[in-house]
């Protein structure tokens, strides 16, 4: 008997040996040992408390910034659903958003409530949970600029309230989330009052800019590499000659050369292999290290 045969009782759903490709924007990747779809926060907390400590736990949002390797993922993959996607104004320029709420929905609801400052989320793929993990942002704004506090569970199911400072944010990183496995439940944000029409106009500009410059309708995971200090990743990839080059079924987009795309039949190995080839070439030609922004998980 293995740990999979003695999983804790839950009110949500447990899926065994389920392919993860349909759960990611790249549409690649092997199966998870177990996928857990919790009914609510209490269901999730109880499950984590009862799950043997040696079982790995991975949280997967909408899979926008994640590359699941072809061998699949050990342990339990947690996928948060509608119960974790609530978005509601809290008064005084504040807004609560669940970890499963899409970033673009958070931007929209903030705008409708006359809360400015969260417009940048219109241009960020994925969910608030992922944004909290990596201090997601774009166009000169990022999560730490608007976060008041975040709510999370530890691997042991303990509830935490974490201030902005507690999370130790820097460029595309939370020191706290990097040091300790956290399952984010939601967060409280604070903006400033503004006219909803003016906010919507700014978000429309962001949408137009994205559609013109990014391959948002392709099978992609968003920005592939972080920008190194003093450099733009897209420019380094472009100048190294990788824009539009095929590697198996993988390619760096002709529209934006920091966007890795699945042209249709790519494997996770194709996508990661192309990324690593580009990293090596950029290092050799320019002496600059490109660090992955896309999270790569699982067995090769």
Swiss-Prot record:
GO terms for biological process: cell division; cell wall organization; peptidoglycan biosynthetic process; regulation of cell shape. Pathway: Cell wall biogenesis; peptidoglycan biosynthesis. One of its GO terms (molecular function) is UDP-N-acetylmuramate dehydrogenase activity. Pfam families: FAD_binding_4, MurB_C. Its EC number is 1.3.1.98. The keyword NADP applies. Coiled coil: none annotated. Its cofactor is FAD. Belongs to the MurB family. This is UDP-N-acetylenolpyruvoylglucosamine reductase.
